[in-house]
Regions:
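Helix-adjacent hinge/juxtasegments
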Residues: 86-88, 92-117
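Transmembrane beta-barrel strands of outer-membrane/channel proteins
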Residues: 33-41, 77-85, 120-126, 162-168, ...
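Short loop/turn motifs that connect adjacent beta-strands in outer-membrane beta-barrel proteins
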Residues: 21-31, 60-75, 111-117, 154-159
Length: 193
């Protein structure tokens, strides 16, 4: 049921965004891009993740961008693919594996126009993993992610950022086994505008 609701919500968001953008005569434009690297751990099983996350930040439709800009908030729709090495040396069956994922429904809010700026990010994505030991039910998993951090403007148009994220990964009920894995991440990266 959660899977069906997520699909319907995603379709509604895409159709609504496209309709509003077309009505305003606007097009989506890239406002920033960047790359992040870091690691994470599942506190209960000690599974470790080491990942690289490139991303692009696209403008929202004009009225949403205008509203957020008015309050000193840069609101972006992020598309973030990632690849990760996964190490599980703490269980009875030691495993090395990988993840390949894509966060498509992701929002990034950057507050203020100072040299040091706070930001928050949240969204949904999908991941393919070969992590077999955890009996995840399927290799295709869905992710819910939330995080925040600070970015420091090194020079105009370029910032370095430090952030923390929490991610829940599960198969959304597509299989009888659906234990899910929660991960706490730390990431450092560069952002270009």
């Amino acid at each position: 049921m959660r899977f069906a609701r997520s699909i319907l919500l995603a379709m509604f968001a895409i159709v609504t965004s496209a309709t509003l953008a077309r009505a305003e005569g606007s097009c989506i434009e890239m406002r920033e891009w960047g790359v992040r690297a870091g690691g994470g751990i599942n506190p209960s099983s000690q599974i470790q993740y080491y990942a690289i996350h490139p991303y692009v930040g696209l403008s929202l439709w004009k009225s949403a961008s205008r509203w957020s800009d008015q309050y000193g908030i840069r609101a972006l729709w992020m598309i973030e693919p990632w690849v990760a090495y996964v190490n599980d040396d703490h269980g009875p069956q030691k495993t090395d594996s990988f993840e390949i994922g894509l966060n498509l429904l992701f929002i990034r809010l950057v507050f203020g126009d100072w040299v040091v700026r706070p930001f928050v990010e949240a969204g949904e994505g999908a991941v393919y993993t070969d992590l077999r030991k955890q009996d995840l039910g399927t290799r295709l998993q869905f992710t819910s992610t939330i995080g925040g951090g600070l970015e420091y403007e090194i020079q105009p148009g370029m910032s370095v950022g430090l952030q923390a994220r929490f991610r829940h990964m599960s198969n959304a009920g597509m299989a009888s086994s659906n234990p899910g894995i929660n991960t706490v991440f730390g990431l450092v990266g560069l952002t270009f505008r």
